């Protein structure tokens, strides 16, 4: 799908493809997008690369309370800052979880 601004109207207008996930990428914020599954579930996602490595995706959360396009975009901005600092958000979360278990 083409890049567009992720808004409530965008979310309501996208119809699922019965055979594959659909991704709609935000044209204002690099890596921020919306994933729609074949069953119609919608989630905000963030796609990134750390130091030229492979592309990775992190699910921010499902569409709906508390995740609005605005709150999800702010979270994606926070994650983008981590990526620019060379921090992999997925690995940082895993490491924090490992430390809590010890």
Feature-to-residue mapping (PLM):
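Basic/aromatic DNA-contact patch characteristic of tyrosine site-specific recombinases
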Residues: 1-102
């Amino acid at each position: 799908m083409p890049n567009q601004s992720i808004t409530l109207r965008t979310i309501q207008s996208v119809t699922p493809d019965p055979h594959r996930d659909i991704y709609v990428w935000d044209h204002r914020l690099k890596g921020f997008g919306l994933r729609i599954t074949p069953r119609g579930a919608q989630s905000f996602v963030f796609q990134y690369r750390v130091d030229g490595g492979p592309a990775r995706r992190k699910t921010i959360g499902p569409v709906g309370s508390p995740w609005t396009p605005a709150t999800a975009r702010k979270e994606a901005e926070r994650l983008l800052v981590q990526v620019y600092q060379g921090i992999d958000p997925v690995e940082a979360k895993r490491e924090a979880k490992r430390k809590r278990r010890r």
